[in-house]
């Protein structure tokens, strides 16, 4: 008896390409494993024998193989229409079984993974008849009727771990193999396949030019369904402060999509992830941060020589606040995904300090073609006409992005928000918390045809440039952010940094008044107290995975000025302990303490009661998880989420909030959320809803 094998079933209707997929997948897996392959077509007892064949397959093939025994079974003689010879299928490290019914209900308890292959009916019929010729044609309808009868009571696609739209273009085996190592039941056996990605090399090109970032992104990724632009849109202002904290945060911009050989996308909702690679989609039931720990954190590539950035390709996107269910908070749902990420096997990185563009691509058959196209796009975006063309498409420097200003509604009226402030102060007085970061949500619906999310973002980045601005497109979901706040950075060498913002004043057009507002913020005892409480919280969060004694506060209650606000910012640094999980270190700090209050866990429970609804992406995080183990994440504030509902409308949501302490004045706190919303609302021509 051999050890119990990993058994992968490939199921689907006749003509879906199961046999070819199984053969190709087995060939690829044999690079690292012993693989046995079984075809159900060898065991069906005739053209009306689907159900009997499934029973025979489970009893005589799956049962013994699942125990690690050889399977002895009776084949079917299709020419003479009766039982044929006795055959043996030997156990192996991996067994692939394919055919209609391979993943039937009776079989699933013995399977490690289920792949469902599908194709349009006309493609399936043509493929099956081309393969089997005239022998099959008289029986097509009879066999198809059996399939439909079986599937009416056994919804195999619903139980599939991987679904593949087999287009017969040769892409299915590679796409499926990208996803199989993510399945928990297969991960141990397929560790060589996952490790193989860590041996990939990065090809780089440095171009000494300053392309217009918006023109370049639009040229390369304007038609991509899934694309990310981490946009240091205040780079020109920050560059005037060489060597400053602001200049360091604003040095690099990153843009990428999920196309190409290595491209993937991932969406997570309530403990379940959906991963896509080309024509294949996998469903993985696993907490997000546990999944992240399997795909990121162990350095998979080395930083290319001469390349100054920390991002060396990997995952980019956003994490929603409701992931707090995995870090000590309660379980709530949100209308938008809890996480949306792409895996970029190629990207453009702009170094604003040096005035260069870097092209990065994992080695792949399509790398040369992409590098050539990206090089041409960078050169075109460096021409004098590029910025003017983008500005014209956006309707001017501060152009209106909607024909009519949207009317926003608030989850809380002014009266309700002030009552919630009082309730938060009651919790503080009772000793249940020290600080409560109370938030609300503004929302509006507009005709989808009247709003171009790309133009909306261009207007936002001009109106309110920020070091952690970003534009994320995930199908019908768009994120347009002008965040000034870093949540957490972990460098490839393990250096950790958090830079919480607590304390906000509006900017004024009059220089004297503006300077006075900045001075008032710097001197505010209330704002300093709020900031210092969050600094203490983040010192604690970082300490869980930091080298003892390495946690330091290098900047306390400094004032930074942006286009529409002054902010109070602190900096906490630490060194990650060698061997610690980077994903767990991120989870230990999530969500950002500046968006919860302190102590974090009990305050999140208070917020759940007070706020009465999910926050979604707001107060989550936006950034990257790089193949060299680095991450840089911003807090998702000053962030407009645009969700195309599919009914011809688009819902706009904007979260705003502020820290409530015992000294808070309700009217001042309400004015603060108006100030924070102003940059986004004014760009849309909208007003704060004061009802």
Where are these regions (language model features)?
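NTP-dependent small-molecule kinase module
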Residues: 1, 109, 113, 130, ...
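Extreme N-terminal, non-catalytic leader segments
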Residues: 1-8
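P-loop (Walker A) phosphate-binding loop of NTP-binding proteins
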Residues: 13
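Conserved lysine of the Walker
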Residues: 18
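Hydrophobic positions on the alpha1 helix immediately C-terminal to the Walker A/P-loop
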Residues: 21
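Conserved nucleotide-sensing/catalytic segment adjacent to the nucleotide-binding pocket
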Residues: 36, 43-90, 94-95
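ATP-dependent NMP and nucleoside kinases share a basic, alpha-helical "lid"
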Residues: 85-132
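Extended alpha-helical targeting/anchoring segments
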Residues: 183-691
């Amino acid at each position: 008896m051999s050890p119990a094998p990993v058994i992968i079933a490939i199921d689907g209707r006749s003509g879906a390409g199961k046999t070819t997929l199984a053969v190709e997948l087995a060939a690829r897996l044999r690079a690292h494993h012993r693989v046995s392959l079984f075809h159900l077509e060898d065991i069906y007892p005739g053209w009306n024998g689907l159900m009997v064949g499934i029973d025979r397959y489970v009893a005589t093939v799956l049962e013994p193989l699942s125990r690690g025994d050889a399977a002895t079974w009776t084949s079917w003689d299709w020419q003479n229409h009766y039982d044929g010879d006795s055959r043996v299928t030997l156990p192996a490290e991996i067994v692939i079984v394919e055919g209609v019914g391979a993943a039937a209900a009776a079989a699933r308890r013995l399977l490690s993974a289920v792949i469902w292959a599908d194709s349009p009916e006309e493609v399936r019929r043509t493929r099956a008849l081309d393969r089997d010729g005239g022998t099959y044609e008289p029986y097509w309808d009879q066999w198809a009727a059996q399939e439909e009868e079986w599937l009416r009571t056994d919804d195999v696609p619903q139980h599939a771990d991987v679904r593949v739209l087999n287009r017969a273009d040769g892409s299915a085996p590679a796409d499926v193999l990208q996803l199989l190592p993510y399945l928990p039941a297969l991960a141990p056996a397929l560790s060589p396949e996952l490790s193989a990605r860590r041996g990939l090399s990065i090809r780089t090109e440095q171009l000494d030019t300053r392309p217009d970032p918006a023109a370049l992104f639009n040229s390369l990724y304007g038609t991509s369904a899934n694309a990310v632009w981490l946009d240091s849109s205040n780079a020109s202002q920050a560059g005037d402060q060489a060597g400053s904290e602001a200049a360091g945060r604003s040095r690099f911009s990153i843009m990428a999509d999920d196309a190409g050989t290595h491209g993937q996308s991932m969406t997570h909702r309530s403990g379940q992830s959906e991963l896509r690679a080309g024509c294949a989609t996998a469903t993985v039931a696993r907490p997000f941060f546990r999944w992240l720990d399997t795909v990121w954190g162990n350095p998979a590539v080395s930083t290319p020589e001469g390349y100054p950035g920390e991002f060396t390709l990997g995952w980019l996107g956003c994490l929603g606040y409701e992931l707090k269910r995995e870090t000590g908070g309660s379980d709530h749902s949100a209308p938008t995904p809890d996480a949306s990420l792409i895996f970029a096997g190629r990207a453009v990185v702009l170094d604003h300090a040096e005035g260069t563009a870097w092209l990065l691509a994992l080695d792949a058959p399509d790398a040369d073609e992409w590098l050539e196209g990206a090089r041409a796009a960078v050169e075109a975006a460096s021409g004098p006409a590029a910025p003017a063309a983008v500005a014209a498409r956006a309707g001017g420097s501060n152009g209106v992005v909607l024909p009519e200003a949207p009317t926003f509604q608030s989850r809380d009226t002014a009266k309700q928000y002030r009552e919630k402030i009082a309730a938060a102060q009651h919790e503080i007085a009772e000793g249940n918390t020290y600080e409560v970061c109370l938030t609300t949500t503004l929302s509006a619906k507009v005709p989808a045809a009247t709003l171009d999310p790309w133009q909306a973002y261009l207007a936002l980045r001009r109106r309110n440039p920020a070091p952690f601005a970003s534009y994320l497109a995930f199908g019908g979901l768009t994120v347009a952010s002008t965040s000034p706040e870093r949540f957490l950075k972990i460098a490839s060498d393990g250096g950790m940094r958090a830079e919480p913002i607590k304390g906000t004043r509006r900017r004024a057009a009059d220089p004297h008044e503006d300077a006075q507002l900045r001075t008032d913020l710097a001197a505010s005892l209330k704002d300093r107290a709020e900031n210092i409480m969050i600094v203490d919280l983040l010192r604690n969060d970082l300490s869980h995975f930091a080298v003892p004694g390495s946690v330091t506060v290098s900047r306390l209650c400094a004032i930074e000025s942006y286009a529409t606000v002054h902010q109070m910012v602190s900096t906490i640094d630490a060194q990650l302990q060698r061997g610690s999980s980077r994903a767990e270190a991120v989870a230990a700090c999530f969500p950002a303490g500046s968006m919860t209050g302190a102590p974090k866990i009990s305050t999140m429970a208070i917020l759940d009661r007070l706020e009465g609804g999910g926050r979604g992406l707001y107060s989550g995080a936006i950034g990257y998880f790089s193949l060299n183990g680095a991450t840089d994440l911003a807090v998702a504030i000053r962030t407009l989420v645009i969700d195309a509902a599919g009914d011809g409308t688009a819902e706009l949501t904007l979260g705003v909030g502020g820290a409530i302490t015992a000294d808070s004045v309700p009217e001042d706190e309400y004015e603060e959320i108006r100030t924070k919303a102003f940059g986004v609302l004014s760009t849309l021509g909208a007003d704060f809803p004061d009802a």
